From Swiss-Prot:
A motif ('KMSKS' region) lies at residues 574-578. It comes from Ruthia magnifica subsp. Calyptogena magnifica. This is Leucine--tRNA ligase. Keywords: Aminoacyl-tRNA synthetase, ATP-binding, Cytoplasm, Ligase, Nucleotide-binding, Protein biosynthesis. The gene is leuS. A motif ('HIGH' region) lies at residues 42-52.
């Protein structure tokens, strides 16, 4: 008997079989229900980390399970190839970003293969390949022609380390999301996408995403930030009025000052003639203010010395510059109501500005602002109105005076998509002095990113390459310049899920195959980290709608179901090289095998929770794999000298084994199909393996039961530990590979029990558990329960009020 489990040998055999038989290559098949499972594709950083292993193990189990359900399953993989890290690594190693990226792809592809993931490698894409990005250049032109892409001078987030512009979503607490550098504000010409045109649909579409975590939907809803309020004009003497936006027009009568951004045109004009104002403006430039940091910074301001006019009372209202007002949000001006806003209250107290209370007369504001809604007073004609009444009446008054209007605002702003770096998709635009902005003709696509042999400076190399940017205008034929900005890498990752469906089409961005795979809500299961909630996931939803409106796809949303997996921790912290707490998957695979690594990563915690790495835990699941191996090998040895009979005429021990087997199958089928609780699936299979290891009877019926049980064990374990199960299934003499086997069915007759366990409570507290025959009636259950010595000690000397029996489950004795 061969009892030695050789992971490397077994896994190599299985992987060779899958590759030679193209086990995971799929095409469209209308006779089957499709299932599209996708994990967020990796950035080719050099090697896989345990977070990758967890993400892709989850996706692979789901894919293999759905394949066993008879569905036409597609699970593709690719590479998010462009981006700053490649430039930084190339700079450090004095190589080209292309060389660094493609070498990493080769290495990581080998790592993924060794983990046994069931990918359709024929669909592999790399976003840095011109065959991929030519189509986003084509889409860019189509969107430009629809005015959904435009260029304007704008104040942007400038990362001084990475030397590029960042989108608002890429600034975290005032710092660059990759470099962690303090972000500066610059005014430069940039390309934008009108994501705000889709703001309402992006919000309302969230209500239809029943398969998404509520946390992600809430984050997106808050980021889009829809609000309904009033835009109010505060006139100025002999000058343009100042527009402010407010969601609390009920407080308008309590305005005692206005604050404007240090970048507001009024502030900049005042600074020309007032050195103190200019000094304050200069000070504001040194402070990194974001929507997130405004809550914590020291609030500072300066009185401009000029006033505006209250639109209803006509009173003079002083104008201040404050360091907490952002020019990029709203109008860059805010009406201040210190009696009813915490920040305004603190600012007014600090600078001795008047405070006028206009809501809830009986509540004191001596120590704090009163921010709740209530009944107006001290508000002239609006006295006695509640919030809704005041909103409508004040809106009507302002509209009649042409000094205000109802308005819907969004926190979401148009997406700045141009980057001042080399390693990205070139923007297909030509700048001509005569013709202005001209699109690159479709026949000239793709605009290919020129290769460089080495990389030795921060910034965009193509700005220094006249052979790239010097061109002729396709309209007038005169000298012109190719755009040297490249696209934000989120542009590439926003539509890759659709390109997988027809990667081999060189004539169209997408074809009819996209509608086959994206039918019924899009990708059936998407897997990735929650950190992508308001970046990639929002942009992908936006792009899906763009592709729909171009007529490529019919679905409104890209991802029907979303699973956000937890992080992999070690010593209580997220694994990172800087902390020195990383675990190399390659070393673990070499030592224990891929199945052991997969098993542990799925067993240690439910998919959505954080997972603590444990060497002892890894050893434990490795022992389990060895136990499964020995179990099947022992059966094979017994089968050499003992025949297998039929499944009938069972004794008690045989019934118990079948009961345990089919109870386990029922439980894990539920956990695999509905809840993805792979940790409980594995725990149940471990218990089943232990049970089967103790059942060694070799009678014909017992051999049939053992065969049935180990078939169920291997089939249900195969999505999780596919190499081992492939090998053992073949060893058992099965002709068809286990990857092509269906998921087993529960034999309900095996679940019929002669006895049942009943929980017994006294006044709702658990006191014992009793076994009864399944044919016993309630009267017998009550009599036997009341006579049980574990119960009589709780009922002795007391009056039994009633006995409640829940059939097959529980008895509750109520006493007093």
């Amino acid at each position: 008997m061969n009892s030695e489990y050789n992971a490397q040998k077994i896994e190599a055999q299985a992987q060779k079989y899958w590759q030679e038989n193209k086990s995971f290559e799929v095409s469209e098949d209308t006779s089957k229900e499709k299932y599209y499972c996708l994990s967020m594709f990796p950035y080719p950083s050099g090697s896989l980390h345990m977070g990758h292993v967890r993400n892709y193990s989850i996706g692979d189990v789901i894919s293999r399970y759905q394949k066993m359900q008879g569905k036409n399953v597609m699970q593709p993989i690719g590479w998010d190839g462009f981006g700053l890290p490649a430039e930084n690594a190339a700079l450090e190693n004095k190589v080209s970003p292309a060389k660094w990226t493609y070498e990493n792809i080769d290495y990581m592809r080998d790592q993924l293969s060794k983990l046994g993931f069931g990918y359709d490698w024929s669909r592999e894409i790399a976003t840095c390949h011109q065959k991929y990005y030519r189509w986003e250049q084509w889409l860019f032109i189509k969107l430009f022609e629809k005015d959904l892409v435009y260029k304007k001078n704008a104040i942007v987030n400038w990362d001084p380390v990475d030397q590029t512009v960042l989108a608002n979503e890429q600034v975290i607490d005032g710092r660059g999301w990759r470099s962690n550098a303090l972000i500066e504000k610059k005014k430069i010409s940039q390309w934008f996408m009108r994501i705000t045109n889709y703001a309402d649909e992006l919000i309302y579409g969230l209500d239809k995403l029943d398969g998404w975590p509520d946390a992600v939907k809430t984050m997106q809803k808050n980021w889009i930030g829809k609000s309904v309020g009033l835009e109010v004009d505060f006139p100025r003497h002999n000058a343009d009025s100042i527009k402010v936006y407010t969601t609390r027009p009920d407080t308008l009568m309590g305005v005692t000052y206005l604050v404007i951004s240090s970048e507001h045109p009024i502030a900049l004009e005042a600074g020309k003639n007032n050195p103190q104002v200019q000094a304050f403006i200069d000070e504001c430039k040194t402070i990194q203010i974001t929507k997130e940091t405004m809550k914590t910074i020291d609030k500072k301001g300066i009185d401009l010395g000029v006033k505006c006019i209250h639109p209803i009372t006509s009173d003079d209202v002083p104008i201040w510059i404050a360091n907490f007002v952002l020019i990029g949000y709203g109008t860059g001006a805010v009406m201040s109501v210190p009696a009813h806003d915490k920040r305004d209250y603190e600012f007014a107290k600090k600078y001795g500005i008047a405070i006028k209370k206009v809501i809830n007369e009986n509540i004191s504001i001596d120590k704090n602002a009163m921010t709740d809604k209530g009944v107006l007073f001290n508000s002239g004609e609006f006295n006695g109105l509640n919030f809704d009444q005041a909103f409508n009446e004040i809106a009507k008054t302002l509209t009649d005076k042409n000094l205000g209007r109802k308005k819907t605002n969004y926190r979401l702003q148009d997406w700045g998509i141009s980057r001042q770096r080399y390693w990205g998709c070139p923007i297909p635009i030509i700048n001509c002095q005569n013709c202005g902005i001209v699109v690159v003709p479709e026949a000239d696509l793709p605009v290919v990113l020129p290769e460089v042999m080495s990389f030795d400076s921060v910034g965009s190399l193509i700005k220094k390459m006249p052979e790239f940017y010097q061109t002729t205008c396709p309209k007038c034929g005169k000298m012109a310049q190719q755009e040297t900005d490249t696209l934000d890498t989120f542009f590439e990752s926003s539509w890759y899920f659709a390109r997988y469906t027809c990667k081999d089409n060189n004539d169209k961005m997408l074809d009819k195959r996209a509608n086959y795979w994206l039918a019924n809500g899009g990708v059936d299961q998407y897997i990735g980290g929650i950190e992508h909630a308001i970046l990639h996931l929002l942009y992908a939803r936006f792009f899906n709608k763009l592709l729909r409106d171009e007529g490529f796809i019919k679905n409104d949303e890209p991802f029907k179901n979303l699973l956000t997996q937890g992080m992999v921790l070690k010593d209580g912290a997220k694994m990172s090289k800087s902390k020195g707490n990383t675990v190399d998957p390659a070393q673990m695979i070499e030592k224990y095998g891929a199945d052991t690594v997969r098993l542990f990563i799925l067993f240690a915690a439910p998919p959505t929770q954080n997972l603590e790495w444990s060497d002892s835990g890894l050893e434990g699941v490795h022992r389990f794999i060895n136990k499964v191996y020995r179990l099947i090998m022992d059966f094979i040895q017994d089968h050499k000298s003992h025949a297998i009979g039929t499944l009938n005429n069972f004794d008690k021990a045989q019934k118990d084994i079948r009961l345990k087997t089919h109870q386990t199958l029922s439980k894990i089928t539920d956990n695999m199909s509905r809840r993805y609780l792979f940790n409980t699936v594995i725990a149940a299979l471990m218990k089943l393996c232990n049970t089967l290891s103790k059942f060694n009877d070799t009678s014909k019926t017992s051999m049939a039961i053992r065969q049935e049980s180990i078939h169920i064990l291997l089939k249900t374990l195969s999505p999780i530990a596919p190499h081992l199960c492939h090998y053992l299934w073949k060893k058992l003499g099965n002709i068809k590979a286990i990857i092509n086997e269906p998921w087993p069915n529960v034999d309900k007759s095996a679940l019929v029990q002669d006895k049942m366990q009943i929980i017994v409570q006294v006044n709702g507290k658990l006191r014992t558990k009793l076994m009864f025959s399944t044919d016993v009636d309630n009267a017998q259950i009550e009599a036997q329960t009341l006579a049980n010595e574990n119960i009589t000690k709780f009922t002795k000397g007391k009056i039994i009020v009633k006995v409640i029996i829940v059939p097959n489950k529980l008895v509750n004795i109520v006493v007093k």
